[in-house]
């Protein structure tokens, strides 16, 4: 037990603009930002972090659609301004590249489908604030592990899954 407690609040605004589309694909332009403030301290002792983070991102997402498959690819460029009130100098700036990919396909007339999903992050700087690190764990990345069981400045993960959906209770 580390006796550390903290809180974090975040407000964000995300937008998507449909730039191109037809029956086989669509392209979205993405733009957004967020503001996060968090603090943590050793219980009944000293404050160990107090952060204010402003983030902005822009990117694109392309979706391709076939008769029995769909592919989605997103790429973002992120900028974050960090104010750490407990260090000197208290200001830092970070640039990151983030993305994700997913593909799903099914076999016609079979109750089987497959899924591939991945995400990545590359940060130009090192030693990112915890709120900006690439984190894995939980049901959306590494199943069976607690959310955030591993994190770092750069990261990549992928899932390959096969699903059977042919069981009927009645």
Predicted regions and their residues:
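Gram-negative/organellar outer-membrane beta-barrel architecture
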Residues: 1-69
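C-terminal outer-membrane beta-barrel translocator/porin domains of Gram-negative envelope proteins
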Residues: 39-170
């Amino acid at each position: 037990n580390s006796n550390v407690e903290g809180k974090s609040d975040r407000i964000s605004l995300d937008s998507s603009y449909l730039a191109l589309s037809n029956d086989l694909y669509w392209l979205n332009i993405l733009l957004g930002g967020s503001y996060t403030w968090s603090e943590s301290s050793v219980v009944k002792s000293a404050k160990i972090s107090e952060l204010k983070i402003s983030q902005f991102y822009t990117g694109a997402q392309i979706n391709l659609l076939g008769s029995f498959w769909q592919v989605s690819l997103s790429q973002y460029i992120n900028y974050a301004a960090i104010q750490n009130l407990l260090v000197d100098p208290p200001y830092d700036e970070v640039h990151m590249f983030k993305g994700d990919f997913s593909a799903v396909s099914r076999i016609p007339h079979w109750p089987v489908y497959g899924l591939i999903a991945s995400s990545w992050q590359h940060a130009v700087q090192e030693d990112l604030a915890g709120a900006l690190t690439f984190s894995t764990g939980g049901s959306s990345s590494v199943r069976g592990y607690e959310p955030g069981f591993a994190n770092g400045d750069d990261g990549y993960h992928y899932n390959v899954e096969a699903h059977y959906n042919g069981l009927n209770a009645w």
